[in-house]
Amino acid sequence: MAKELSQEEVLDFLCQSGGKVANASLLVHFKRFLRDPQAADAVLLKRRDKFKRYINSVAVVRQEGSVKYVVLRNRYQDLLGEDIEPAAAEDAGSEGERDQVVLPTEHGQDYLAHTFGQERLKQANGGDVICDCSEARAVVPSAAPHSHSQSWDVGESMSEKARVNPSHWDTKRYYPEDPPVPDSLPVSPPCTNTRQSSFTSTSRPHNHSLSSNNLSSSFSSPESPGLVAKPYNASPSPAGSSPNIREQTPKSQSLSKAANAAFVSVTCTDIKEQREGCTELLAPQPCQNWDYSQPEQLHSAQEHHSDLHREHMTNGFHSPDPLSSKYPHLTSPCTPLQLSPETDTTPDVPLAHNLAAVSYPSPPLPGNNMYGMWMCQIPVFKSIRCQLSLQDLDDFVDQETCGSEESDSGEGGDCDTEPRDNDDADDDTFSSDSHKEIPKLCVEQESEYLHKCHSNIDYSGKNDLYNSLLEEDRIGVKDTLVEHGDVASMRIDTSKSVYTAKSFLTDQAPILFELVRNAPPNKTSSCFQGALSSSDEELLDRDYRKRRRSSRYKKSANVSVPCVQPDTDRLLTAKCVSSSSFLINNNLQEQSTQAQFLPKYNSNFGLKKSASQKSSVVPLDPKEHDWIVKTAAGLWIQVYGMFSMDPHLALHKDFITGYTALHWFAKHGCIDLFNKVVIGAKKAGIELDMNVKSSNGYTPLHIAAIHGHHKVAIMLVEKLKVNVKVRDNSGKRAWQYLNSATSGDVWQLLGAPKGKTIFASCALHTAQNLNIRNKTSSQLARKSSLAAFRKTQHQRRKANNQSFLREREIYSD
């Protein structure tokens, strides 16, 4: 039964039904909304109209016998099979235990939007708990073995780890005016490796809370690409502790809400699924004096989380510091997160770390701005790709990358994160306090733009870790350490990374940037385009982009700014590379980012330039051109000389009329050269098609009949055995083009029908002319002579009879 009447629900049901479902089954599935006895007639009518629009937008109705089926449209057929598959049931005794908790959001707040689609996480095991997107519930599946995981520790002490089960949930209801203070930081990583695995929350308020001491989440073994949560010192769950939460948590039993959350995109061990996970980390609850009016805390908190990740990636351990130095408003300390350096992959977004000595304190993070702080990469339906064309996608990425002209981000491809032209521009760093907007991502698009870090962080071993990731995934991420006095900054070159822009705050931006992965050939740096392009259209376009670019920002001339665009045929098609491409590539070897796209860009540009400047000119071989001109002009001596040197010229067609040399011979009536060319081609081993057609469908026999060259037609039929039944594009045969002066033998030779009345012979023409002359003379004699009126009636009748007998004799002959 459907839970809501929406486009996503209709598309989900059709995809789960294999793209084809009976009309009756579809109506039964949405019966709750279409035939609600408690709803008014007007509401039901609106629902029916809305339901019809939803169906017509994604499916069509087909009649098969007496049953009507609703069939998914072809553009959505690629969505079949992409729904989240049930996780395979695992034996709790052999595989251990695996805890996974999906925590609710704060009262009246959503961390994710409806536009990501309603997704369901299904678990096939009877002991597992179904997690629905409309109601945030806990999921407690089996755990992965402890020996194959590296853990992120969340808790104040390692000895107080406890397994989280439904029996630990608190039943007390809290409200925003009385925020609770939980003792742990629950973590909810995804467990599936499908592209649709995600945890989403809706606008419905959730009343769930967790009251366990500590919880830890860990990476699974390299064999399983997904992420699982695993506690230390996990105690076996009691009997009956893992039934469905839907049965254990009635309406009367509600759980408190977490005040804020942060979304971190975690890279899985599988390269193909490294950006599929989305981990929801909940910070501890604040005390009574929570302050929600501090938007400046976001940047400092992001740096705080980034420092932890860098410290863990370097040392593999940490020394926990109290949270009071960083967040004095909190009564419960924030437990650190641990990531072992032996892991093969690194999170896409840096995690958090607590620093004891900081120059300024940061207040706690409000929950209503968490969606803007962290990029949560949520997979959505591929119908976005079906609805957006390549041009729309290009425009969308341009808009998301550069923003509008009136915005403070400037214009141009590399104006997103450029530092302002102020006194601190020489430091190549920018402070997080200089921006009052939602903080930018830690992974920037350009290699020149740096993110400020604290000076007491060790960066040893950072390059080795990212180099291993670069060799495996080849996403083009390079790290360079730059130190300016007491400030160490990390610069990341993401020329091919999927995260190449700051504007990931929209709903579909993460999945769009993941789809396109590669830089397009037509989006290179301005100096590179200046070296290659020469057409007026591209020059005007480049000048227009320069005028639109804001003068407050500096332009980097040696860094290419790729605008993301799909390149799905890169491994399927092979494109020819001209020699000039290798010359340019040799001259620009030091520009590795630009040179790797140069051959493809140069070939496309060459084709575009030749098509625009020489659209009306078709290049021909000089010998072929001379052959066409000489055969059309009837220069038979030169034609036969060229044929003697290259007999294959007889096979060449005129690109306009489609005539071959045989057509020209038949048109000019050159029977001698016709015979010589045919005999010479046989000697050279070339088979000539005597029934070859021109652009209008004319064969040489048609051409000979049209121009009245009967000798050529007789030779073609008798000696060369051409097919007289071939028709041209008008549906006519060769004999239908013969004129009246053609003899009957030629008519019969070209296949004219025997019962067809052909033109009269000469004798018949003479007799008919004589008869007409006699009739005319007799009529003139009767009308013009006065003696005719004096003749008797018998004489006039006798004269008329004689003329009738004379006409009979003529026709009998």
Swiss-Prot record:
Residue spans of biased composition, Pro residues class: 177-189
Cysteine pairs bridged by disulfides in the record: none
Family of the protein in this entry: Belongs to the SOWAH family.
UniProt protein name: Ankyrin repeat domain-containing protein SOWAHB
Gene label: sowahb
Keywords from the UniProt entry: ANK repeat, Repeat
Compositional bias per record (Polar residues), positions renumbered to this chain: 191-202, 245-256
ANK repeat copies, ranges: 657-686, 696-726
Listed Gene3D superfamilies: Ankyrin repeat-containing domain (1.25.40.20)
SMART domains membership: ANK
Pfam family, one: Ank_2
Bias kind Low complexity: ranges: 208-244
Organism annotation: Xenopus laevis (African clawed frog)
Region (Disordered): 142-256, 400-436
Feature: compositional bias, Acidic residues: 400-416
SUPFAM superfamilies: Ankyrin repeat (SSF48403)
Entry keyword Nucleus: no
InterPro entries from the UniProt entry: Ankyrin_rpt, Ankyrin_rpt-contain_sf
Residue ranges, compositional bias (Basic and acidic residues): 158-176
